[in-house]
């Protein structure tokens, strides 16, 4: 599965210039970088929420799942929200148990806390199998316990489906825990890409080294 080269320009200024890459099935790709580096713009373009300057981004797949930073909840029960993305009730029950929301399955989803809404949105996405999945800061509203629980479920979903998963994260520790490959964005450009051991511990670009030193990896 390939991502074709693309760029994004706002008011005459290029905010993202991506050279393209090949995604391997069954791998987790963590996107790291400072605020404003282009991480979320990258995810939104791949998800089709934003348009790139060029036509088309993904090659060889139209099966893409996306969880944005801001999650939506319809005015119905938590379980009913989850079943909007698939009617397999046994799977919904298993996911509710796995993410710790079973006791809230009948609560109106628009009354959940931020962390609960994020967990609901994550398992709602997991009701379907996709070739590629984009998660934009999926655990930002969660505490450490539910973050680790969600990371375990994400890794399990990738193993189960064989999808390629792109994870935008502000947490270098999260990238270290569950990523296979890491992409470092700097001022709208992909500055470093490779196995997490190389990017996080033996980076080549001085900007990457400075970023990692600042955030304590």
Predicted regions and their residues:
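Conserved catalytic motifs of ABC-family nucleotide-binding domains
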Residues: 71-84
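Conserved ABC ATPase "signature" region
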Residues: 89-104
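Conserved ABC ATPase signature
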Residues: 108-112, 116
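C-terminal boundary and immediately downstream tail of ABC-type ATPase nucleotide-binding domains
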Residues: 197-217
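H-loop/switch region of ABC-family ATPase nucleotide-binding domains
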Residues: 169-170
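Catalytic Walker B motif of ABC-type/P-loop ATPase nucleotide-binding domains
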Residues: 133-136
């Amino acid at each position: 599965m390939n991502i074709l080269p693309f760029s994004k320009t706002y008011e005459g200024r290029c905010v993202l210039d991506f050279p393209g890459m090949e995604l391997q099935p069954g791998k987790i790709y963590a996107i790291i970088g400072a605020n404003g580096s282009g991480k979320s713009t990258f995810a939104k373009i791949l998800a089709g929420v934003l348009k790139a300057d060029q036509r088309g981004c993904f090659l060889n797949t139209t099966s893409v799942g996306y969880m944005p930073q801001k999650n939506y909840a319809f005015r119905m029960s938590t379980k009913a929200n989850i079943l909007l993305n698939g009617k397999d009730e046994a799977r919904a029950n298993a996911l509710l148990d796995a993410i710790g929301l079973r006791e809230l399955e009948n609560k109106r989803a628009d009354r959940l806390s931020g962390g609960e809404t994020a967990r609901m949105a994550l398992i709602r996405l997991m009701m379907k199998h996709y070739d590629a999945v984009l998660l934009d800061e999926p655990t930002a509203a969660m505490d450490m316990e539910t973050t680790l629980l969600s990371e375990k479920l994400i890794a399990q979903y990738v193993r189960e489906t064989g999808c390629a998963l792109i994870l935008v994260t502000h947490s270098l520790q999260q990238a270290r825990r569950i990523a296979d490959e890491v992409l470092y964005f700097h001022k709208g450009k992909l500055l470093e890409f490779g196995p997490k051991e190389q990017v996080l511990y033996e980076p080549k670009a001085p900007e990457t080294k400075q970023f990692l030193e600042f955030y304590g990896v």
